[in-house]
Amino acid sequence: MAMVVSVWRDPQEDVAGGPPSGPNPAAQPAREQQQAASAAPHTPQTPSQPGPPSTPGTAGDKGSQNSGQSQQHIECVVCGDKSSGKHYGQFTCEGCKSFFKRSVRRNLTYTCRANRNCPIDQHHRNQCQYCRLKKCLKVGMRREAVQRGRMPPTQPNPGQYALTNGDPLNGHCYLSGYISLLLRAEPYPTSRYGSQCMQPNNIMGIENICELAARLLFSAVEWARNIPFFPDLQITDQVSLLRLTWSELFVLNAAQCSMPLHVAPLLAAAGLHASPMSADRVVAFMDHIRIFQEQVEKLKALHVDSAEYSCIKAIVLFTSDACGLSDAAHIESLQEKSQCALEEYVRSQYPNQPSRFGKLLLRLPSLRTVSSSVIEQLFFVRLVGKTPIETLIRDMLLSGSSFNWPYMSIQ
């Protein structure tokens, strides 16, 4: 399809220029009335009430107001969401702006699983990255406008990131404040997960495994309840987000505390030794354990620090993929805020590792390869029996710190 590109004209130029020069059409009826009055017989008249003063610029002012109102409701040319301004040559929303910037900066290549003609709107823009980038380019967003390594061009809104008065992170006060609150929300510092947790070569007993698993899950939920923006969401959205992401947060917490994952005690904790199981099921189950171990080891190999873990968990938590969200676009914007915080933190703290940010993000999709049902079977069947973890998550959100686990007595 051929695309016609015309020279863009700023709507503000028409507003600033005022009404076009030439005869004022509003003055024509006034001259006709004066001529008619002079031709008519003169009769005494009582003084009339003065009318509103003549304002030659009224028509122009009204046009300016209408133009200003239309400026405030400009749609994103990519997905139709409300535009936040002109980015990379076109009016786009924050989501499409950030997506285009990430794609160009990291020179990402996407693949369409359909016919390369997927609908891109507010509700489907996250389903196909290939078609989304294709539309960004089709509507005229310019690759050359994305400057490598550039700081975000716009200033944050008041209160958007001004969360604490902590020390600035290389001058980025709003980022350091956001990350500081993510870190402060951790209910259990690494040192309080248990002394055995930090000894990977130490084989933990069944009771210790169950205790640690309870801490990791409780920590994920309690952390989410105390981070910025999450408590402001509707409780139904909070439950939906945690129901979808609890297993990913659990894996991240397991990697952060270097949780020992030896096969024998894990199988014992899952109760596989007590119930007969076919050889095929045992092999499949052990394969799931291997996947879990691989994800934890790959994260540990990157030597992810506490601030990075907090940002990564926020990126995982704020996902618009959860079902039934009341405002998926808002959730997506929170994910992008967290991703920007991680990107700037890595750039400032690890300047000699230019690929570090990309490596961290590449670990996120594979977190979902760890089956949540396997995590339940491995760590929680002895703890809660057949009670679904989603039910426990809802109860933890509603009851908060007063929620009691059977294995939460050790401090």
From Swiss-Prot:
Q: Where is this region: Disordered?
A: 1-68
Name the CDD domains on file: NR_DBD_COUP_TF, NR_LBD_COUP-TF
Q: Name one GO molecular function term.
A: RNA polymerase II cis-regulatory region sequence-specific DNA binding
Organism for this UniProt entry: Danio rerio
Q: What is the documented function of this protein?
A: Putative transcription factor that is required in photoreceptor cells precursors during eye development.
Spell out the subcellular localization from the entry. Nucleus
Please give an example of a GO cellular component term from this record: nucleus
Question: Where does this protein bind DNA?
Answer: 73-148
Against PANTHER family, the record matches this protein to: NUCLEAR HORMONE RECEPTOR
Q: Which residues form the signal peptide?
A: none
Q: List the disulfide bonds.
A: none
Cross-referenced Gene3D superfamilies, in alphabetical order?
Erythroid Transcription Factor GATA-1, subunit A (3.30.50.10), Retinoid X Receptor (1.10.565.10)
- Could you tell me the Gene Ontology terms of the biological process aspect for this record? atrial cardiac muscle cell differentiation; brain segmentation; cardiac atrium morphogenesis; cardiac muscle tissue development; cell differentiation; endothelial cell proliferation; negative regulation of transcription by RNA polymerase II; nervous system development
Keywords noted in UniProt: DNA-binding, Metal-binding, Nucleus, Receptor, Transcription, Transcription regulation, Zinc, Zinc-finger
Family affiliation: Belongs to the nuclear hormone receptor family. NR2 subfamily.
Under Pfam families, the record lists: Hormone_recep (PF00104), zf-C4 (PF00105)
UniProt name for this protein? Nuclear receptor subfamily 2 group F member 1-A
